[in-house]
């Protein structure tokens, strides 16, 4: 595993996050720095790297990611604060129109892209939707399973698939570059809670608590909303 580029010198506060949350985290920290003299050091990588460094480096103070994944990784937080909820959507390219998420099972949708249900949060949510809606068997031969959400979006943008299961954050600002997107009822998949946790063994406890407290402010909530949460 490639190690993350952790700060080499004394730091005010180190926040580690999955690369998929980079824009969200950057915007949150920018808003935070307007209210505080603390200047967090940011570290990004895949979530496997992030959790490993959080456990073993002794440098990471706060981890941002999906709560279920962080819990399974065995990280201990004191406290953990929700930033927002991820929203699963079905998106389609120009020239196509879907009136319901269930339309992905119709014959005219010949290719349906989705992230890996084993390794990707939104892939897991997508599988839960297909199972809950009773259409998993109807779509199994048309599924194109890829590694990540951005790959699904790329296929939708290029028109190489007729629809894709992705997240709202990734498609909400694409405008007329795609045909459209539709939210999937959140009752059809387990909640996707994106949040920040102050590690129980963090060295910068007071600074970390200050950042966690900021996440409950209107300014932080506005950032989360901007990113589709």
Predicted regions and their residues:
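Exported/periplasmic ABC-transporter solute-binding proteins
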Residues: 11-44, 48-229
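Bacterial N-terminal signal peptides
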Residues: 1-7
